[in-house]
Amino acid sequence: MDKDERLLKIVLRYREELQRKIKERQYEMQQDNNDHYLIYNALGFTSKEGYQIDFQQNVGRFLYKYAGSLLEELAIKCIKEAHPDAKEKVKLPNTIDKSPKTVEIDCLVGKRAYEIKWKDATTDGDHIKKEHKRVKIIKDAGYVPIRIMFFEPNRDQAIKIQAKLKKLYEDIGGEYYSGEDAWRYLKKETGIDLKKLFEKLKE
């Protein structure tokens, strides 16, 4: 089994698990109390439309979660193909304060500590404070923090947050790659064109 086949096997596993999860939720929703449709009706939506909205909202939550987990696992697998000694989910003690007790590195290759995100649309200002603390703990432990985010946000506030995070990483001596730069960086580091694999699946 070559690299692409191993990666494809992971994609198919996630696809099957996601479809199973959606079917389970669909069955659960058929047993639900839908009294809240009364308010949907008042706002101009039929009960049938209300069900579809609720169902798609559930599907959306599952899809978002599985998309993030899939891309993170695939990126780590690519890194491990190139660096068999890479470690996953490495926890470091919080050396700054008591919350949280530990911070996690998604993938560690020597001194290079990878944070992998499929996308990050947060608009929460506290996110920067939390990330600053996390990155400083990693840097103080002797590692180089590297953030790889494959898809960039669309909303202005979220874009501003990411610009601040990029500066944060660079100021502390780390690296930040997003959008096309993230795909290119992964390919350069591992020799695997993960985006091309996804484009093949789309065909």
Please state what every model-predicted region is:
Residues 1-83:
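Interdomain/boundary linker segments immediately adjacent to catalytic/signaling cores
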Residues 50-58, 98-102, 111:
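Conserved N-terminal glycine/acidic-rich loop preference
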Residues 66, 70-74, 102, 126-133, ...:
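Short, well-structured alpha-helical interface segments that form or flank functional binding sites
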Residues 79, 105-118:
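Conserved catalytic cores of phosphodiester-cleaving nucleases, focusing on short active-site segments
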Residues 80-86, 140-142:
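Secondary-structure boundary elements
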Residues 88-108:
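Active-site metal-binding core of divalent-cation-utilizing nuclease and nuclease-like domains
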Residues 118-171:
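Catalytic cores of nucleic-acid endonucleases
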Residues 150-203:
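Domain-level recognition of nuclease-like catalytic cores that cleave nucleotide substrates
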